[in-house]
Curated annotation (Swiss-Prot):
Organism from which the protein derives: Thermococcus sibiricus (strain DSM 12597 / MM 739)
HAMAP family: Idi_2
GO biological process, one term: isoprenoid biosynthetic process
Localization in the cell: Cytoplasm
InterPro entries: Aldolase_TIM, FMN-dep_DH, IPdP_isomerase
Protein name per its UniProtKB record: Isopentenyl-diphosphate delta-isomerase
Entry's Gene Ontology molecular function annotations: FMN binding; isopentenyl-diphosphate delta-isomerase activity; magnesium ion binding; NADPH binding; oxidoreductase activity
Catalytic reaction annotation: isopentenyl diphosphate = dimethylallyl diphosphate
Cofactor: FMN; NADPH; Mg(2+)
Binding locations of FMN: G71, M72, T73, S104, N132, K203, T233, G282, I283, R284, A303, L304
Chain positions recorded as Mg(2+) binding sites: E172
Amino acid sequence: MVKVDKEELTVIRKFEHIEHCLKKQVEAHVSTQFENIHFVHTSLPEIDKDEIDLSVEVLGRKFDYPIMIAGMTGGTKGSQLAGKINKTLAKAAQELNIPMGVGSQRAMIRKPETWESYYVRDVAPDIFLVGNLGAPQFAENMPNRYGVEEALKAVETIQADALAIHMNPLQESVQPEGDTQYKGVITALAELKGELSYPIIAKETGAGVSMEVAIKLESIGIDAIDVGGLGGTSWSSVEYYRAKDEKSKNLALKFWDWGIPTALSVAEVRYATGLPIIATGGIRDGIMIAKALALGANLAGVALPLLKPAVNGDVEGVIKILQQYIDELRNVMFLVGAGSVKELKKVPIVVTGFAREWLEQRIDLWEFLRDRRL
């Protein structure tokens, strides 16, 4: 039997992740809860639709639209596929002037020859680019644990503008080869923030960020939170398809729908902190983007819907999807009388169903919703 080292296994795993996301049903069976967030229609918008301003400023950069292409891949076997995906997405981001993230750079740290699969500056010189490393790699009990050297390498090798630290305890816990060392991560991130001159974004990957975690992250100086909520791609489902034995399959299956729905995570983080929020996890149209922004997000991130055109190198296909979302967002803003994203955050919203039940137990919902008027 041929023994594969852990770094090579990481590269192979990245390819398997893309393959399953393209070919299998990998989304959560439960919703983002955006369906329980409602706008109040206004019959007299008192604005012109074509004059609505969709631009936002986040982390010191101005973007034409409040949308981010979320990190998906990098460092796959042979690197060509990941490189093709990232360059396609980057060209779209450049065209639309929106930010973009890359997938986990762990493969690049251990196998530097994969760096080109993450590099997009040749096709997107102006985009706000976010690098990506995993939280477990900074844990105190992790062999060869990461520090500022690896963080700088992740950012500077691809000429990124910020670094995302992805928190994925769910995926790691159901992955046979998963890294479940998380002790000391908060301390490590606090130290990293003290030494790294680039913005750090704490990023979940499908299970959501609670207000308790958000408060801890804000207290150590983290610059922004990507909530990565439940309702979109379930990485437990991806590990279900990867599993080689019944025990591993059963564990991943049980946790397929674990987490905090995206809409509720956005509300919790906004209620508890003043940090910029990126809403990812099941964002599938411009109406959901509008609801995320109204709940307090600064950007909404999209991943899975863009993967298929990106795999085919179809830049126009990626732009077409994003443009549809933009058109839908603009239409929502017109129908609620919001001439800007700042105004959208003030319009009345109504919370019903499970979302209301959850938020009434977790936050002061009345305080969160009151005084919302233009």
